[in-house]
Amino acid sequence: MKPQRSGPLRHGVRGTVALNSEVCDDYPQVVEDAVALGWELMGHNQSNALYLHLMSAEEERRVVLATCERIEKATGRRPRGWLSSGLQESWHTLDYLVEAGPTYVADWINDDQPYLMNVGGQRLCSIPYSVEINDLPQILRAGRSSDEFERMIRRQFDTLYREGAKSGRVMAICLHPFIIGVPHRIGAFDSALAYIVRQEGVWPATGSEIIEHYLASGATF
């Protein structure tokens, strides 16, 4: 996404990037720029062409570990979050994530709040993600316009904002720059983001900031 089209920068929002580790080799400047902006990088397999649930247990473990190691080498920091390509896991994925180092995973799209998972006696957090407020299924697959997508974002926010008055809610807006970042769409996203950040009490946070806050709250579920 070109800097002049980057709504998050204008509105003081830092993103959490689902990063294929191959990007560290193929497009290192992208990774360097994200780090310089203070954005968070979470593991997203080595490539979107790889799906963990189709691998042998040995290959899956190797991919999870190699992904985290390559991102750490490129950024100096082990990724704290993970999103599997296609949100596809095997029965072993969570065990390998605990071994590799991430503290949260975004594959489980079943709640609007974080929650803890017991993985072999170790703690791993689930963080809210969305396949609804997501430009790929809505714009590319369902053929919705950017204005329709903006209305979806606003309605999602309004509901979660009301509910959040009693107990905090997490709203994920899941984007792909090659979709939302084109000239005829970016204005709709910018408008939606401006609407959200001007509401009182909204906290634009990265994935790890959300999880740190959740754990510090004393939550046990």
Segments and roles (model prediction):
Residues 4-5, 31-32, 61-68, 94, ...:
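Generic structural signal for well-ordered alpha-helices
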Residues 4-13, 71-77, 163-166, 196-201:
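A structural motif corresponding to the C-terminal end of an alpha-helix
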Residues 9-90, 122, 128-141, 172, ...:
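Metal-dependent polysaccharide deacetylase catalytic core of the NodB/CE4 family, i.e.
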Residues 25-41, 94-105, 187-194:
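Short, electropositive alpha-helical surface patch
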Residues 104, 154-221:
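C-terminal domain-boundary segment and adjacent tail
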